[in-house]
C-alpha cells in the first residue's frame, strides 16, 4: 500500500524523508519532487529495484535511467574520469538542471540497463530530493510517468499514473520549473550537447568553450531518461550518445 507525505509541512517532511529512505534501502520505489519534474526512484545498486522501476514505467532495459546524487563527491565516485570540463561544470551548475554523461567506473556493482558503459548524472536543486539523496546515496531516477504520458509536475499526477507500484510518495507541491535539464555528453574528445534545456549553451560555454551540437539534437518534453546509442566509445567508434526520443533522456 502506498503512503503519501506532504513535505510542505515540516513534521510530515521529516517522516516522509525517513519513510522514503527506508523504502529505497529495501528495494522499493519512491516518488520525489525535483527542480524539473517529479521522479520515480530506486536504489541504483539494487538491480531488482531498477528493473521494477522500469516495469512500473512500462519500458525496457534499452532506456536506462539516469542517476541522481546528493553531493558532487558522490558523482566523482561513480565515474571513470570527470574529463577536461567535468569538475568545472559541476562546480558551476550543480545542484541544478544540468545532466552530465560520463563513462561509468568499471568497478561499480550495478545494473541500470543497456548503458554501454556510460552513466548520466545530475544533482537536483530541490531540498526534499537532496534530503533523500544524502541518506540513500545514488538513486536511479526517471520521470514519474508511464511511457508515452506527460511527465508529472505534481504528486497527484505522478500517483494517478503509477498508483500502488510506488511505496512512498513525497509531495513537495508543484515543481518550480517544468523545463527539462540540459544534457551534455562528456565521454568524447569534446563536450557534446545532447539536449537543449534549462541551462543555455551560452551559459555552458562560459565554462566549456568548445561544445558541439549532436547532429540529431532535438528538444524533449520529458527530462527523465538517458538512452545511449551504438557504437559507444567503450565499444570503439564514435563518442556520442543518442539524442533524446519523445520519452527523453534524463535528469528528472
Which residues fall in each region the model found?
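Active-site-adjacent structural elements in enzyme catalytic cores
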Residues: 1-252
Amino acid at each position: 500500500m502506498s503512503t503519501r507525505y506532504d513535505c510542505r509541512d515540516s513534521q510530515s517532511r521529516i517522516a516522509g524523508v525517513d519513510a522514503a529512505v527506508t523504502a529505497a534501502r529495501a528495494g522499493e520505489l519512491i516518488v520525489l519532487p525535483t527542480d524539473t519534474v517529479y521522479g520515480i526512484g530506486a536504489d541504483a545498486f539494487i538491480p531488482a529495484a531498477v528493473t521494477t522501476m522500469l516495469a512500473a514505467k512500462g519500458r525496457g532495459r534499452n532506456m536506462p535511467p539516469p542517476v541522481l546524487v546528493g553531493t558532487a563527491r558522490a558523482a566523482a565516485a561513480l565515474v571513470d574520469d570527470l574529463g577536461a570540463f567535468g569538475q568545472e561544470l559541476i562546480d558551476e551548475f550543480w545542484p541544478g538542471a544540468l545532466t552530465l554523461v560520463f563513462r561509468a567506473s568499471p568497478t561499480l556493482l550495478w545494473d541500470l540497463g543497456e548503458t554501454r558503459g556510460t552513466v548520466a548524472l545530475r544533482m537536483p536543486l530541490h531540498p526534499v530530493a537532496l534530503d533523500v539523496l544524502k541518506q540513500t546515496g545514488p538513486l536511479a531516477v526517471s520521470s514519474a510517468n508511464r511511457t508515452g504520458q506527460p511527465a508529472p509536475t505534481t504528486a497527484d499526477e505522478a500517483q494517478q499514473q503509477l498508483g500502488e507500484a510506488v511505496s512512498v510518495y513525497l509531495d513537495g507541491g508543484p515543481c518550480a520549473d517544468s523545463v527539462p535539464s540540459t544534457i551534455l555528453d562528456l565521454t568524447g574528445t569534446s563536450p557534446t550537447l545532447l539536449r537543449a534545456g534549462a541551462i543555455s549553451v551560452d551559459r555552458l560555454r562560459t565554462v566549456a568553450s568548445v561544445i558541439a551540437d549532436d547532429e540529431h539534437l532535438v528538444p524533449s518534453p520529458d527530462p527523465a531518461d538517458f538512452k545511449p546509442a551504438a557504437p559507444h566509445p567503450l565499444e570503439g567508434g564514435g563518442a556520442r550518445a543518442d539524442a533524446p526520443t519523445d520519452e527523453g533522456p534524463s535528469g528528472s
